[in-house]
Amino acid sequence: GIVAAVLYPPVMWLYGFVGVGVLSTSLILALLIWYVFYSRSRVVDVGASIFVALYAGFLPCGFLLVREAVPGFWGGILVLGIMCGVWLNDVFAYLIGRRFGKHKLAPRVSPKKTWEGFIAGMVASVGVWCAIALIPPVDMGFVEASAFGVLCGLAGILGDLAESRFKRNSGVKDSGTIMPGHGGMMDRVDSMIAVSFVSAFLLFGGGCIPYVL
């Protein structure tokens, strides 16, 4: 699963979805062989391997698709803008939630997250996406950008909560100390992973940028 996760981005870049299909098929066949011939293997291990490969390897390819769709300087700016939406969502949610938060968003999964912080993060996400609409190669109005900002904000929160659940199931409080108060670097990465493919799907599906792979 880890090997496949590492291979997904270069395979996507070199061979597109045909290569991804071949890699995914190879992964499933390899896991089936391992499950059949290794007596200590469990179904849950097979499922976990597939999940890790798709979540950590396939989903981040969304940024690659977006970058390839908009060549040159503006492609990098577009990807950076999407990332900024995730970062500002996290920062505003943390700052406003810490200062004004009183209503818990998901107390069993992530006790520190609040509805006040959630709303602040969504506003920040919408603001960034409205700025993204101003990038010349992107064909997107402000209403559409606002909707995309909300959806990507939700995707980021979902990825963040999922990572919090993973940590709790593993008995880990924080996934790092690089960013104090934010739960660790993995919180930022998981939000980014979730937003990566969602943003690509929205931009391509909405006809905002051309699909090239």
Region locations from a protein language model:
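Acidic (Asp/Glu-rich) catalytic motifs at the cytosolic membrane interface
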Residues: 84-102, 106, 115, 119, ...
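A short, terminal or domain-edge coil/loop segment
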Residues: 49-58, 161-166, 196-199
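Juxtamembrane boundary at the C-terminal end of a transmembrane helix
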Residues: 201-213
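Membrane-embedded alpha-helical bundles of polytopic integral membrane proteins
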Residues: 1-151
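Short, conserved aromatic-histidine micro-motifs
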Residues: 141-145, 182-183, 189, 207-209
